[in-house]
């Protein structure tokens, strides 16, 4: 068909443009060490938390993009976003600075920076971030259809309730940075994982009906979360993961002050891969089990791994409460 031939270049250019936008997202990993190095060690968690709170744009997008689409058509959406990005570029150009002291010395090779990746702690931080960021991204994508399928809600109501998870998960990252500076990355991450474990345990339980034989005959009981309890638990989980995203990067600034760029990049990559792979696994699990809450069962198991790993490598050697808990045990 000649129409398909004419549309091929358009599709190809659209794909290339999409890849370019995705590559631009890598600037987040560049910005993390850039921001951190302007602040003393005891304020780096707060600085990176405020910077990382920009992730809340993903939640705001759920409200803004549909409004623009309905009012002006889909072509206006990328135009508006392009204008915002251009404005941000101008502001950055006018008000940002460069300090040569923040640069890696020329005698330090790129391969030397990557040697830190052999450190088992880096793998552990990748695992933590694959939960608090990768899980956040994955569930943000999954929640709307979960509400529609599990509770029969209208898609507009479902999107609004899903924002109760995704919006705090971005905005409150700054508070997580403040807490990490005050109490230490380890203490904040430890409690984040326990709160996640409790929430995911409750969220994992599927809607269940069971019958008990009593002296008066069969008694059927129902166990399951209603939409209000479910949304409340998701909100708590979103807040916990917001704090966790900040505390993981506080670990990095504490343990690798001279190599924040390379380490934060690989940890960020782990989070991005989690956000990509987990929705696929959610769908596969639901197809295999027929249980929608199997997504939370998977996340529950992953959090178990984090808690066990953290206990054997950190908790046994440090306090998580009290005056001696303020510093990372690995710093």
Model-identified regions with their sequence ranges:
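Juxtamembrane intracellular "pre-TM" segments in multi-pass secondary transporters
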Residues: 99-126
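Helix-to-loop junctions at the C-terminal end of transmembrane segments
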Residues: 173-184, 286-287
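C-terminal transmembrane helical hairpin of 12-TM major facilitator-type secondary transporters
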Residues: 186-248
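Helix-loop-helix hairpin linking two adjacent transmembrane segments in secondary transporters
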Residues: 50-96
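Cytoplasmic helix-loop-helix junction between adjacent transmembrane helices
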Residues: 17-54
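C-terminal membrane-cytosol helix-exit motif in multi-pass small-molecule transporters
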Residues: 82-103, 306-314
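Extracytoplasmic gate region of multi-pass secondary transporters
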Residues: 120-171, 245
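Short, small-residue-biased leader/transition segments that mark boundaries at the very start
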Residues: 1-13
């Amino acid at each position: 068909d000649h129409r398909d031939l004419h549309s091929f270049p358009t599709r190809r250019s659209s794909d290339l443009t999409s890849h370019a936008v995705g590559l631009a997202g890598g600037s987040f990993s560049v910005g993390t060490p850039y921001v951190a190095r302007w602040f003393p060690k005891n304020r780096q968690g707060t600085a990176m938390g405020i910077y990382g709170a920009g992730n809340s744009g993903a939640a705001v997008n759920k409200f803004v993009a549909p409004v623009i689409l309905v009012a002006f058509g889909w072509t206006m959406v990328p135009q508006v976003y392009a204008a915002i990005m251009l404005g941000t570029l101008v502001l950055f150009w006018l008000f940002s600075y460069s300090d040569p002291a923040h640069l890696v010395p020329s005698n330090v090779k790129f391969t030397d920076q990557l040697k830190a990746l052999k450190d088992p702690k880096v793998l552990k931080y990748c695992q933590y971030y694959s939960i608090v960021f990768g899980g956040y991204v994955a569930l943000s994508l999954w929640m709307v259809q979960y509400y529609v399928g599990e509770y029969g809600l209208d898609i507009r109501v479902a999107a609004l309730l899903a924002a109760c998870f995704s919006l705090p998960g971005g905005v409150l990252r700054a508070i997580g940075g403040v807490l990490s500076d005050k109490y230490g990355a380890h203490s904040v991450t430890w409690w984040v994982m326990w709160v996640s474990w409790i929430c995911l345990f409750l969220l994992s339980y599927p809607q269940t009906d069971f019958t008990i034989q009593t002296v008066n005959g069969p008694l059927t009981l129902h166990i399951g979360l209603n939409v209000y309890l479910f949304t409340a638990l998701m909100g708590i989980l979103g807040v916990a993961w917001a704090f966790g995203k900040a505390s993981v990067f506080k670990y990095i600034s504490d343990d690798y002050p001279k190599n924040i760029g390379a380490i934060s990049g690989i940890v960020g990559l782990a989070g991005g891969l989690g956000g990509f792979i987990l929705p696929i696994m959610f769908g596969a699990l639901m197809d295999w089990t027929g249980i929608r809450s199997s997504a939370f069962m998977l996340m529950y198991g992953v959090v178990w791994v984090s808690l066990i790993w953290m206990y054997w490598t950190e908790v046994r050697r440090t306090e998580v409460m009290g005056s001696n808990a303020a510093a990372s045990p690995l710093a």
